[in-house]
């Protein structure tokens, strides 16, 4: 990958990579080409007001949390990256987080600034630009006839999507979702890849895949694991959400939606029961405040242009 990136650098003014693609930074340093990092999660850039990846939201502990987090990153990446950068004659790696995983030129955080305004101490090189989504006409989709009929045949359903997280405990995920649907007495569209069920079963319709951006606006609420994609899908659809985080990263997304006023408190997957999830669904469906706030947030997010902001910053980074 390093050699391939060196070839890319030879014909590029700026190279963009994910924060974890440290070989991109190495190749750019070797070539003298500016590099930018893309982050789909806002909890990787140090700030006094934001907890690090996986840490609790205790603001007074954030400086200590970031020091510990930096040490964890050193243990995970430090030895390998230090050896590699040294072998290429590149600047010495002192801290893997700041010297390898972050760009000293431009970090693009693909998160809605409506949901997560940039912390005041981030400075100009860390930009919350908005999520990257194609225009609707670039991703045309219409539901299959049976799903279209289901969507029109009664009250708007609740959309359930745990993404790839459901594979961590497929049976538990299935029992939790179907039990919650029964407890909440709602119609539901359930997205589960690899599920045995497909099509309509009473008030539930099973799909293996459907684009959240197009399907969510046809639903009353979303029950999601809280990844970047599903979080922004709920936000753009203007519907309230119940976040059921499987891992610690997803807890932050759940807290952000709750803080924004469009979601109930997160309900961790490993503690959730059909009864508790069903009650949480009824809570969001019955809350006019959550529905109104979700609609207002969607209007604000619709005015964002994450791709356009990112392109503008990258163009400014290119040599003149």
Predicted regions and their residues:
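Conserved nucleotide-sugar donor-interacting segment of glycosyltransferase catalytic cores
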Residues: 1-64, 114-115
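Structural detector of well-ordered beta-strand residues that form the stable sheet scaffold
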Residues: 15-16, 36, 159, 189, ...
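Short His-Asn-centered micro-motif
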Residues: 17-19, 162, 224
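Residues in the short beta-alpha loop(s) of Rossmann-like NAD(P)-binding domains
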Residues: 41, 194, 247
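Nucleotide-activated sugar donor-binding and catalytic core shared by glycosyltransferases
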Residues: 8, 62-98, 104-111, 125, ...
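Donor-nucleotide binding loops and adjacent catalytic segments primarily
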Residues: 114-221
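Short, charged, surface-exposed secondary-structure boundary motifs
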Residues: 45-52, 137-140, 216-218, 252-254, ...
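A short helix->loop->beta-strand "cap" motif at the edges of active sites that frequently abuts
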Residues: 31-34, 105, 186, 239
């Amino acid at each position: 990958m390093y050699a391939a990136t060196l070839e890319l650098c030879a014909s590029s003014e700026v190279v963009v990579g994910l924060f974890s693609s440290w070989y991109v930074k190495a190749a750019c340093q070797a070539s003298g080409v500016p590099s930018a990092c893309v982050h789909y999660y806002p909890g990787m850039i140090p700030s006094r007001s934001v907890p690090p990846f996986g840490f609790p939201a205790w603001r007074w502990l954030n400086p200590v949390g970031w020091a510990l987090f930096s040490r964890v990153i050193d243990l995970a990446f430090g030895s390998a990256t230090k050896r590699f950068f040294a072998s290429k004659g590149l600047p010495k790696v002192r801290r893997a987080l700041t010297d390898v995983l972050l760009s000293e030129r431009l970090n693009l955080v693909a998160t809605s600034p409506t949901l997560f305004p940039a912390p005041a101490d981030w400075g100009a090189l860390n930009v919350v630009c908005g999520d990257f989504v194609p225009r609707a006409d670039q991703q045309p989709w219409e539901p299959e006839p049976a799903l279209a009929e289901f969507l029109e045949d009664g009250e708007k359903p609740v959309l359930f999507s745990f993404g790839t997280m459901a594979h961590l405990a497929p049976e538990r995920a299935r029992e939790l979702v179907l039990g919650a649907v029964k407890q909440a007495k709602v119609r539901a569209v359930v997205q589960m890849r690899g599920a045995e069920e497909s099509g309509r079963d009473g008030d539930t319709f099973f799909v293996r895949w459907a684009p959240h951006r197009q399907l969510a606006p046809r639903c009353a609420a979303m029950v999601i694991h809280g990844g970047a994609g599903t979080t922004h899908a709920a936000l753009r659809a203007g519907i309230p959400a119940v976040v059921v985080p499987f891992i610690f990263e997803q807890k932050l997304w759940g807290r952000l939606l709750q803080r924004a006023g469009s979601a109930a408190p997160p309900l961790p997957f490993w503690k959730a029961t059909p009864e508790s999830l069903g009650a949480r669904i009824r809570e969001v469906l019955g809350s006019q405040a959550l529905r109104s706030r979700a609609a207002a947030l969607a209007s604000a997010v619709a005015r964002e242009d994450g791709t356009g902001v990112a392109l503008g910053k990258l163009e400014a980074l290119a040599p003149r």
